[in-house]
Amino acid sequence: MNKCIAFHSYKGGTGKSTLACNSAILLARKGYRVCLLDLDIYAPSFHLYFSKEPRKWINDFLTSSANIQDVMIDVTDSFNSQQRHTDSIKSNDHVGEKEVEISGKLWVGLSNPQKKEIFKLETADTNTKRQAIRRFIHLRELLMSDFKADYIIVDTSPGIRFWSINSLAIADILLLTLKMSDLDIDGTRIVAEEIYRCFIELGSKAYLVYNMVEGYCVPRQTISNKEEISNISGSTIAQKPRNDIASVTQLLSQQRSDDDDWPSSLSTDLGIEIISFIPCYCDIQFLRKEFLTVLKYKDHPFTFQIEKLIDAL
């Protein structure tokens, strides 16, 4: 059964783009035909992730000035050839784990990052926007028919905006992504009550995805008794004494206890099931290509979390 899954959030910074990319890549790795769409019209990022420039952008398709074949880029072979080269190097060095090739197909559709193109969509007249809504629906239909897509993964703009709402309208499954902060919680309530309720009534399924949850990363133990150590630039960095580490650990434990109840309470209040708790993996946040984690590090805990999320869907 074909599925269209949209990653959305009340505000930016919840990691939805990373989750969307890794979910799409993992599905393709499993042998599925996957189309990944950057429908974050206001702040697109996939062109940087994949270092690709298409013949035509999604913006062009929405304004009826491009066909879908000119928009979608097949990135399967480029990933696999890159991995074979990397595996060869690792094999010679006898270190690291080999990356896993994509056995399915992965296409990417990119939004134009240029200011004038974003402004053109944002300031379009009512008739143009009405036509664009039809094009959104047609986009989904073409990906299902022409590309035989098993899955369409959509990264949307955060918040309650015209283009983000219409991105959600083409999805069967809505993943409302949030972090464990008051701003995310309050904003998620607004989005769920004002937007998601309508989509659920029309047959869409919605779930809460808690991302960057505390519990994986722990404070690094001090490696020296010295109060200061030199960093790379030669300047000094003050080190926390060991009893400070204990205090931080105790504080984290207290925070965890205080936060134990509200995730389930929010789920109950909104009538939206929690589908995943994904810890904050500090090492991933500092990767230059965190969107490739499931491909490059198949045994990483984050990869298992994405596996669980996909299985739950």
Annotated model-derived regions:
Residues 29, 134-275:
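Conserved catalytic-core segment of NTP-binding enzymes
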Residues 39-42, 113, 158, 179-180, ...:
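Short, ordered loop/turn segments at secondary-structure junctions
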Residues 17-22, 185, 189, 303:
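Short amphipathic alpha-helical segment that frequently serves as the phosphate-/nucleotide-binding helix
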Residues 52-56, 194-195, 224-227, 293-295:
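Short, hinge-like loop/turn segments at secondary-structure boundaries
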